[in-house]
């Protein structure tokens, strides 16, 4: 079952890593550089190179013990877990995190945007067994205008 890969708080049990943790962790996987996802004080940060650059500008060069850059589409094997980033289309460097273990595929995404623009890498649809997504504006009360008239 795909949900057994993740615990509460987006904790990947098998590798003791947290996705977008709100408190400092020994191993953090960061989806993008906005302050509600990227925070300082982690032991190690796995993120796209652009997200790491944003974090260093925002929080300082030494805002984490170490940085592990991972490009889009490049699988990283850690024990029996594979982590791969795919563009989320939200901001420069924003990533969806594909976590694979035991034949199961879980995608965790912070903010994302499906329509392409020139400020970020375009969103890519990722096949998965379970999708965990942010829903800041997911309630029906939020009605956004079409992007062509919004800007």
Located regions from the model:
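His/Asp/Glu-rich metal-coordinating catalytic cores
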Residues: 2-12, 18-23, 27, 33-151
């Amino acid at each position: 079952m795909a949900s057994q890969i993740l615990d509460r708080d987006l904790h990947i049990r098998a590798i003791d890593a947290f996705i977008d943790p709100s408190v400092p962790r020994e191993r953090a996987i960061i989806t993008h550089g906005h302050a509600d996802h990227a925070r300082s004080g982690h032991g190690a940060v796995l993120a796209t190179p652009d997200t790491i650059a944003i974090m260093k500008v925002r929080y300082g060069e030494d805002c984490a013990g170490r940085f592990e850059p991972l490009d889009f589409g490049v699988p990283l094997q850690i024990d029996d877990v594979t982590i791969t980033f795919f563009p989320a289309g939200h901001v420069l460097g924003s990533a969806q995190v594909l976590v694979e273990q035991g034949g199961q595929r879980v995608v965790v995404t912070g903010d994302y945007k499906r329509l392409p623009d020139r400020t970020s890498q375009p969103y890519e649809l990722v096949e998965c067994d379970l999708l965990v997504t942010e829903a800041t504006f997911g309630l029906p009360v939020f009605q956004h205008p079409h992007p062509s008239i919004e800007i």
